């Protein structure tokens, strides 16, 4: 754990702290329908025109049921829209490589993935999708799925801030304003910055380069439809090919990568994602991309404090998130720096560099892995499947917590607020008082909705993983046995339900069974979790505020900080402890004993 790593970690944390307040203040203006921003002269006419085209009355707010219905309807239409584009790709423009239509099961998986802000990819973008599909089918969802998450967080915060009311905002207004005033302007500047660092942005056909020395590679055997071929034992067949030419990818990459990071989407333009030199050219681009992943989630904690008129509460939530983040990044960094025990027994010194870009090294790989799984981003600059057992445990555990450490844009805050409600409920039980949160009584219905959202996540992950483990279709995708194979399955369904999108890529997921189950897993983890959270918002907004007294439990300071972290670790982690013990924990001890999988 070198000094340079500590310096880079300090720079990252200082930069994150510095952008939190400005981002929070700007979010407050964006999420206020009457708020004014620098972009009003240009964007206000566009905003009003959008409302007219959509037939939306921006002055009419929704109750929680109307808000939920609008969100579900919009997401359904968007999912079908993307599915149709992928199925008709061969008839659509901007397809210089002449890619064919995407298979039905893969098209469903991809449409569900990008609709839910997951961006799980059972395909390689550079060999499957046209420029039109990338821009219109996927980048569209990168914007609106991120805006949807921020809108839901805003609705919950309004419900906490208001009292004796019925409405939590207008979903369509929140969606439009977040997209126009927050995501588009920042992404425009961000994309120009990425181009300045060396990222490509064009519509050229792929460049063909002849290799000086042809090379032999082993690849999965596929049929004419691009589907992998299985042997009699259910394993994927491998064939040897000689490669004499290389296709160098081109296309509108910078514009997609900007929103991919800022919107915590994570889906790579190319299969190698942020480890590819086109998607992440320099150390500076690497740092800025990591900061952009946390930027909106961090700013939302300040927005929370401002809206409830208790800025100390917002900062306490922020500090709790940073503390959990530091715990993860330090464990992952230590595990990867310690290296593989089997290599050490053979006299090979050094940390674990397998699956990592030499230009990023161990620290930046560990930091990026922690950031991308604390948020529901899923972009990677290294291969998580190649991490040590404990190093891989960290991203898996982060996802299973619900990615509430800054989290996906919006999703991180509303996920953490669920734990806040449970924390004050536990505090009330311990002191024998009716639990209160910012003057509002937390009753049985509120706790049920909070717990239901957490149980849906756990059931989606563990239920689908259990099905995969006992079914021939699930086991057919495994290329590793033992605890590591279990970890790969757990990671896949955790990533799906948690709307993360990263993977332990040793699992062959592009099969009809995995495409279907992972697609359902993503939809359940996104929308079935959001409904009880909005129901909680509907309950909180109707409550009266009780004046604070000497016995009121404060929602800022050290006591609340400790209770919140304890609630996150106890309730969030205990659901998955048995499965984690059988996966990465057992693998760690077996690796130390000299056994690999």
Mark where each language-model region is.
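Membrane-proximal intracellular helices of multi-pass ion channels
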Residues: 2-597
């Amino acid at each position: 754990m070198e000094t340079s790593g500590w310096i880079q970690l300090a720079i990252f944390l200082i930069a994150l702290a510095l952008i939190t307040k400005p981002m929070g203040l700007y979010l407050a203006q964006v999420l206020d329908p009457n708020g004014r921003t620098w972009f009003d002269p240009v964007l206000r006419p566009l905003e009003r025109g959008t409302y007219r085209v959509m037939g939306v009355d921006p002055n009419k707010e929704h109750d929680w049921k109307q808000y939920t219905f609008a969100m579900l309807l919009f997401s359904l239409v968007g999912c079908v829209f993307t599915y149709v584009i992928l199925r008709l790709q061969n008839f659509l423009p901007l397809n210089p490589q002449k890619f064919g239509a995407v298979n039905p099961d893969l098209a469903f998986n991809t449409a569900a993935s990008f609709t839910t802000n997951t961006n799980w990819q059972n395909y390689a973008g550079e060999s499957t999708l046209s420029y039109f599909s990338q821009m219109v089918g996927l980048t569209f969802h990168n914007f609106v799925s991120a805006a949807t998450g921020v809108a839901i967080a805003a609705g919950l915060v309004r419900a906490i801030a208001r009292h004796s009311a019925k409405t939590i905002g207008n979903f369509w207004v929140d969606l439009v304003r977040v997209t126009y005033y927050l995501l588009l302007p920042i992404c425009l500047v961000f994309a120009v910055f990425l181009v300045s660092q060396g990222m490509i942005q064009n519509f050229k056909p792929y460049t063909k380069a002849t290799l000086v020395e042809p090379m032999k590679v082993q690849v999965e055997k596929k049929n004419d439809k691009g589907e992998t071929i299985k042997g009699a034992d259910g394993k994927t067949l491998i064939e040897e090919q000689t490669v004499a030419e290389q296709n160098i990818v081109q296309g509108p990459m910078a514009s997609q990568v900007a929103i991919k990071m800022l919107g915590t989407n994570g889906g790579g333009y190319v299969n190698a994602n942020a480890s590819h030199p086109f998607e992440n050219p320099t150390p500076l681009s690497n740092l800025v991309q990591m900061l952009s992943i946390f930027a909106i989630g961090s700013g939302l904690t300040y927005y929370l404090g401002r809206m409830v008129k208790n800025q100390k509460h917002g900062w306490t939530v922020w500090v709790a998130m940073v503390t959990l983040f530091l715990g993860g990044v330090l464990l992952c960094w230590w595990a990867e720096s310690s290296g593989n025990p089997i290599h050490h027994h053979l006299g090979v010194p050094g940390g674990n560099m397998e699956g990592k870009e030499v230009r990023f090294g161990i620290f930046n790989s560990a930091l990026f892995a922690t950031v991308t799984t604390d948020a529901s981003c899923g972009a990677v600059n290294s291969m998580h499947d190649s991490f040590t057992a404990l190093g891989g445990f960290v991203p898996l555990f982060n996802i299973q917590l619900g990615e509430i450490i800054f989290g996906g844009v919006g999703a991180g805050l509303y996920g953490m607020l669920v734990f806040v409600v449970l924390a004050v409920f536990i505090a009330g039980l311990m002191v024998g008082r009716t639990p209160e949160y910012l003057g509002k009584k937390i009753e049985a219905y509120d706790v049920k909705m909070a717990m239901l959202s957490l149980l849906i996540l756990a059931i989606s992950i563990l239920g689908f993983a259990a099905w995969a483990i006992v079914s021939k279709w699930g086991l057919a995708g495994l290329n590793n046995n033992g605890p590591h194979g279990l970890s790969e399955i757990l990671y896949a369904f955790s990533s799906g339900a948690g709307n993360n999108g990263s993977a332990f890529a040793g699992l062959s997921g592009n099969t009809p069974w995995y495409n279907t189950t992972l697609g359902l897993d993503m939809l359940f983890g996104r929308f079935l979790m959001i409904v009880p959270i909005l129901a909680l918002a509907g309950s909180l907004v109707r409550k009266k505020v009780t004046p604070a007294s000497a016995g009121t439990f404060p929602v800022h300071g050290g006591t609340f900080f400790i209770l919140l972290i304890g609630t996150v670790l106890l309730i969030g982690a205990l659901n998955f402890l048995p499965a984690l013990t059988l996966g990465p924990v057992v693998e760690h001890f077996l690796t130390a004993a000299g056994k690999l999988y």
